[in-house]
């Protein structure tokens, strides 16, 4: 049962912010602002000491709720065109999870979501080879964990980056037939899962 303590308020503010964003009631910049407000309910010094939390030598024991907010915040920074901040936040919370400060059945799945945020940040910064390498790692782990949604997201992102690298290089570094084969894999997995958004996205890109 949700009460009026800080942890519950933090949970509600995060949930409402995500819902408003996905229902197109707020823009990405507002999502960042609201998520940071939720975070500061427990990390009251975030504005002043965020660089301390994100420093390479620090591993801070964030709570599960803080990690979820930070994970969403990383995605939000990507959405509003600040991939550098997204990368810093993703690396920060991955250090916390890798140090096993938080253990739950969902920890490994959470890591994959965070790593994908990191890969998307690399994409936004035009570091396509870095993104591709990370996505291939994510795909292997997602298959092992039987994390179906992440399998299709990683596969789709892999094809996107391969295609982008080919376009920029002006040569076929990655075989086009292999890219199309991977796109078909994504399409059929998405169709089997009833994920029309991904299925339509792939169908559109396949026709290009």
What are these regions (language model features)?
Residues 11-17, 65-72, 110, 116-117, ...:
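"A position-specific structural signal for the A-helix of alpha-solenoid helical repeats
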